[in-house]
């Protein structure tokens, strides 16, 4: 079917791009945010594609205060922590977008992994999310 063909193509392209023989694949149906707070991944690079539902949200480096990530938020929600100044700073991917999220595990990128989160999911809304990682 179309989904399995697309997943196979995405995996092939990911492996070719990064010259790896295998990739860790996760295909997940979600009815709540998997990662509701902004964070960065401790991997070299993660491929993310949302097939249905709201897609991943992210922030550019020039709009954030990284000291407010994790414990630095002092338990505050993202919008109150001082991580970013306004809601207009939040960028949103669209369903079907293929994104390569560079993480802190990328050589030379240890302090600047892409800051992102799962979007809020409305009642009765579901997401179908594919992620690929190096293994």
Residue positions per predicted region:
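N-terminal start-of-chain detector that recognizes signal peptides
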Residues: 1, 18-23, 71-74, 99-105
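Signature of the catalytic double-stranded beta-helix
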Residues: 1-29
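Intrinsically disordered, low-complexity boundary segments flanking structured domains
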Residues: 11-15, 37, 45, 116-119
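Short, well-ordered alpha-helical segments in soluble proteins
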Residues: 14, 18, 51-54, 103
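A structural signal for short, well-ordered beta-strand segments and their strand-loop junctions
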Residues: 24-28, 49, 100-101, 129-131
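Generic structural motif
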Residues: 30-32, 53, 104, 135
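Catalytic core of non-heme Fe(II) oxygenases with the double-stranded beta-helix
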Residues: 32-95
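Catalytic core of Fe(II)/2-oxoglutarate
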Residues: 82-135
